[in-house]
Amino acid sequence: MGYEILGLPMAYYIAMVLKVLVVFVFVLLTVAYATYAERKIIGHMQVRLGPMRTGWHGLLQPIADGVKLFFKEEIIPSKADKFAFLIAPLIALVPAFIGFAVIPFGETIEVGGYKIPLQIAAYYDTASGQVVDLNVGVLYILALASIGVYGIVLAGWSSNSKYSLLGGLRSSAQMISYELAAGLAIISVFMLSESLSLQKIVADQANGAWYAFKQPLAFILFFICSIAEINRTPFDLPEAETELVSGFCTEYSSMKYAMFFMAEYANMVTVCAVTTTLFLGGWHGPSFLPGWFWFIAKVYFLIFTCMWIRATYPRYRYDQLMRLGWKVFLPLTLINIVVTGIIVSL
């Protein structure tokens, strides 16, 4: 017999550690190459080539950008609140990455006779024969999204710059406006699945139609509101270059600036992963390929959609942004909840 800890073999713990590392590396590589993919996709949509110089067809461009930012000078404004200025990028970046702890990437795998779910915050219960995960996974993700905006607001305030402060204030107002609508949009999913567990929501979609077909309005509203919440075009008012130089990032340079950049793209990947889990059946797909492949394919399709939207739509004015959130999306989500409640009760 091999060495055991708490009645479980070392292979089990090694597999758990490897699972965390694989998810982290996957997210990190996706974030890095999402920047490259966006530049190439938008370039081709505008009849350009995009990055071409660094590596074959510019494939090494993310590495070149990372090296450049790493060696750039770290500048801190003389009148900035230095502690808050330095901690703000971390507050924005960390929640963007740890949200993946509750997202199921696929079915269980077997290691040393033990089944291990492809989800960080989950384990396989041999007594019930089911995967046990965080039963409020969706609330966990919504809470992390709320924490992330504190980093942006803190960056705007601590920089002691008018442009940065306006960007931070815009971000907080935008997050409040659209997180409310996004949260209400997915209540209809909870009503259908009768659970906040992401494993249960995915399992329910395996036995019938995806919730994107059962709840098309909720799917569209949640995806659009989530794009607005992470400040992606056409909702990128907090860092509007034509108005605020670079918004809350104006005074940042070097790796601190890169951390905000990574947080934006990590949030985009998180939003696409959550949308896949809630509305597109998670990892379920034709059985000739493993579940994790279908999950990644769906996530990448939604990431491409985000980039397509950026290349297609111009930026909203701020009054249009607020009007859309409060006078259009919020009433539509409430109407959808009422209609879903009536249908479920019949």
From Swiss-Prot:
Keywords for this protein: Cell inner membrane, Cell membrane, Membrane, NAD, Quinone, Translocase, Transmembrane, Transmembrane helix, Ubiquinone
Keyword NADP: no
Protein origin, superkingdom: Bacteria
Enzyme Commission code: 7.1.1.-
Reactions catalysed, as given in the entry: a quinone + NADH + 5 H(+)(in) = a quinol + NAD(+) + 4 H(+)(out)
Predominant place of localization: membrane
Annotated GO biological process: aerobic respiration
GO CC term (a single one): plasma membrane
Annotated transmembrane regions: 14-34, 83-103, 136-156, 172-192, 208-228, 260-280, 289-309, 324-344
Keyword Ligase: no
Location relative to the cell: Cell inner membrane
InterPro entries assigned: NADH_UbQ_OxRdtase_su1/FPO, NADH_UbQ_OxRdtase_su1_CS
Enzyme's top EC category: translocase
GO MF term set: NADH dehydrogenase activity; oxidoreductase activity, acting on NAD(P)H, quinone or similar compound as acceptor; quinone binding
Classification via Pfam families: NADHdh
Topology versus the membrane: Multi-pass membrane protein
Family, per entry: Belongs to the complex I subunit 1 family.
Quaternary structure, from the entry: NDH-1 is composed of 14 different subunits. Subunits NuoA, H, J, K, L, M, N constitute the membrane sector of the complex.
PANTHER family for the chain: NADH DEHYDROGENASE SUBUNIT 1 (PTHR11432), NADH-UBIQUINONE OXIDOREDUCTASE CHAIN 1 (PTHR11432:SF3)
Functional summary from the UniProt entry: NDH-1 shuttles electrons from NADH, via FMN and iron-sulfur (Fe-S) centers, to quinones in the respiratory chain. The immediate electron acceptor for the enzyme in this species is believed to be ubiquinone. Couples the redox reaction to proton translocation (for every two electrons transferred, four hydrogen ions are translocated across the cytoplasmic membrane), and thus conserves the redox energy in a proton gradient. This subunit may bind ubiquinone.
The protein's name in its UniProt record: NADH-quinone oxidoreductase subunit H 2
Source organism: Geobacter metallireducens (strain ATCC 53774 / DSM 7210 / GS-15)
Lineage of origin: Bacteria, Pseudomonadati, Thermodesulfobacteriota, Desulfuromonadia, Geobacterales
